[in-house]
UniProtKB/Swiss-Prot annotation:
Compartment(s) where it occurs, according to its Swiss-Prot or TrEMBL record: Cytoplasm
Gene: cmk
One term of GO molecular function: dCMP kinase activity
Keywords of this entry: ATP-binding, Cytoplasm, Kinase, Nucleotide-binding, Transferase
KW Coiled coil (keyword) present: no
Record's keyword annotation contains Nucleotide-binding: yes
Top EC group: transferase
Organism: Staphylococcus haemolyticus (strain JCSC1435)
Family per record: Belongs to the cytidylate kinase family. Type 1 subfamily.
Binding site for ATP: 10-18
GO biological process, one term: pyrimidine nucleotide metabolic process
Principal place of residence: cytoplasm
Protein name stated in the entry: Cytidylate kinase
SUPFAM superfamilies (alphabetical): P-loop containing nucleoside triphosphate hydrolases
Amino acid sequence: MDLINIALDGPAAAGKSTIARQVASKLSMIYVDTGAMYRAITYKYLQNDKPEDFKTLVNQTTLELTYDKSKGQRILLDNQDVTDFLRENDVTQNVSYVASKEPVRTFAVEKQKDLAAKKGIVMDGRDIGTVVLPDAELKVFMIASVEERAERRQKENEQRGIPSTLSQLKKEIEERDHYDMNRDISPLKKADDAVTVDTTGKTIEEVTEEIMTLVNNI
């Protein structure tokens, strides 16, 4: 099969990253977690006491993706590996705001396009099929119920030792959905030629196979 690019979009906790990793592994492709890029910039934003000059912030930022056989994708922010800090609560609560800023978006999208230029990429995010990879050979828009997404996020938090309640997480997810879908720059929306995959009630294996079937039908 010729080298292709696959775009996976969808709201928070729809399972994008998990499925993207599985699909990339099965196809021996490179997985790019674009959300981690925005989280890294958000981490720097928080470490710098929330500056509002985002253009200066990104101009003074270096961001590099590396791949570790045992740990997967790692994010180097200003030459420091910050991957293990990117799922902290304060980062999660601020990433939508930071990612909505035009200088941040431009900075990240340029890097994402460069990574995908040679094909063979599985990339997940919110605007991959619409903005970053509008010519991707396969575009998938993943959805799931708010209830299930909150349960998934709670399990992730438990694994990291982060206390949270389902009601709190449901509220946060609903608020983030609204923010992501209504922001001025690169709002979350399904590309016209994307295939919708509902992951509610499905196992990782079931969703992966569903997308592999789509790949095989290209």
